[in-house]
A protein has these predicted regions:
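Residues that line or immediately flank small-molecule/substrate-binding pockets and catalytic motifs
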Residues: 48, 79, 131, 203, ...
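Flexible mid-to-C-terminal extensions adjoining Fe-S/redox cofactors in radical SAM and related proteins
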Residues: 1-25, 47, 269-271, 275, ...
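Radical SAM enzyme [4Fe-4S]-AdoMet core and its adjacent flexible, acidic
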Residues: 1-7, 55, 121-290, 294-305, ...
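Conserved alpha-helical substructure of the radical SAM core
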Residues: 2-126, 215-225, 344-347, 354
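Processing junctions and N-termini across compartments
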Residues: 31, 35-38, 268, 328-331
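Amphipathic alpha-helical recognition patches that constitute DNA-binding helices
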Residues: 28, 32, 171, 186, ...
Length: 354
């Protein structure tokens, strides 16, 4: 998410904001700039649905300038597939000029030499590229398009080639599901071969249905035979820091029980707050604003940047209402989230208990 030591968090100011449910700073903001996608991933609905047109680049620029004034340190661009919008290098350049670090998630299939160079020269600081198996046929079965493995792996190599033009980190995202988990043992070797800096193993969402969801016996097999090999190899290659990163469904019996139910916070929020409503926001392709991806379309939007300034929404009654429900979180979606736990722990250690 963001490096706590580099955010310039004012301890007392944040504590008072938390205690009074006031706005702090949107330190980290996700921009979902496009809904559609050029792949047909079996665990995703973006390619199955047609939505309204996205917010214009000019409006996104105005919001980025506003975010800079409010103290945003990092913007993460995603979709759908963000590279279906030709203005992405322009948006990255604009945000970088306003002192904001920019990262992006992409499937990589639309990245060629020119686009890779443009993105790095525009100031892109991090890119997560989706690879769902080191085995070509499995990756393309999941992604639904033949030839996608070659173009995606090439994108990783291209970013590695041009990274000297900026300060770019390259990571591989892998959704672990019933379909692919038995093929992932050599994922660290592929990542290293392509020049990636790290891997992120992401547990499949339970909304993907029984065909993809991991049964208890699947998790047991993964944890006993595959995850240990991934952990050992990935740590040796410098792709992960701790063994925990190789166990997206948890390691202990209790964690596995909760993970099987999709509760990837593993009970943390039963007794601790989530600080995302004070430090984070998500702006959807259509301008709707949510606290995070877990609340996106699971609850009404907090506002829309098409007809209101982001500042009005950030400091408004709807955001305040969410902040009042965070001690501990009363939202069911929070129990299913593992995105913020590490940072929430660090913030809790900094300003709590209270």
């Amino acid at each position: 998410m963001y490096n706590l030591e580099q955010t310039g968090i004012e301890k007392d100011e944040l504590l008072q904001a938390v205690l009074n449910a006031r706005a702090y700073k949107p330190l980290y903001v996700k921009l979902k700039v496009f809904y559609g996608c050029n792949l047909k991933c079996e665990m995703c609905n973006h390619w199955r649905e047609t939505r309204e047109p996205p917010v214009s680049p000019e409006r996104f620029k105005a919001v980025i300038a506003e975010l800079a004034e409010l103290g945003t340190k990092k913007i993460h661009i995603s979709g759908g597939e963000p590279m279906l919008r030709p203005q992405i290098p322009e948006l990255i350049d604009f945000a970088t000029a306003h002192g904001i670090k920019v990262t992006m998630t992409t499937n990589g299939t639309l990245i060629d030499k020119t686009r890779a160079r443009q993105l790095v020269e525009a100031g892109l600081r991090g890119v997560n590229i989706s690879i769902d198996s080191p085995i070509r046929r499995m990756h393309e079965k999941i992604r639904g398009v033949k030839g996608s493995f070659k173009s995606t792996t090439k994108a990783v190599s291209l970013f590695e080639r041009y990274r000297h033009k900026g300060k770019l980190s390259v990571r591989i995202n892998t959704v672990v599901s019933r379909t692919n988990y038995q093929t992932l043992e050599t994922l660290p070797d592929l990542a290293h071969e392509l020049g990636a800096d790290g891997i992120n193993l992401i547990p499949v969402d339970d909304h993907c249905g029984e065909i993809l969801s991991m049964r208890r016996r699947d998790i047991k097999l993964f944890n006993e035979e595959i995850a240990p090999k991934i952990a050992e190899r990935a740590k040796t290659l410098g792709l992960i820091v701790s063994d925990d990163e190789a166990y997206p469904f948890g390691q202990t019996e209790e964690q596995v029980r909760l993970g099987r139910a999709g509760r990837y916070a593993f009970g943390y929020y039963d007794s601790h707050p989530c600080y995302a409503p004070w430090t984070h926001s998500l702006i959807d392709f259509n301008g709707n604003v949510y606290v995070c991806c877990m609340t996106r379309e699971r609850m009404p939007p907090l506002g829309n940047i098409v007809d209101r300034s982001f500042k009005e929404i950030w400091e408004g009654a709807n955001y305040r209402g969410i902040r009042l429900k965070m001690h501990p979180p009363a939202l069911a979606a929070c129990r299913r989230c593992d995105d913020f736990i590490d940072r929430n722990r660090k913030i809790w250690e900094t300003i709590g208990p209270y």
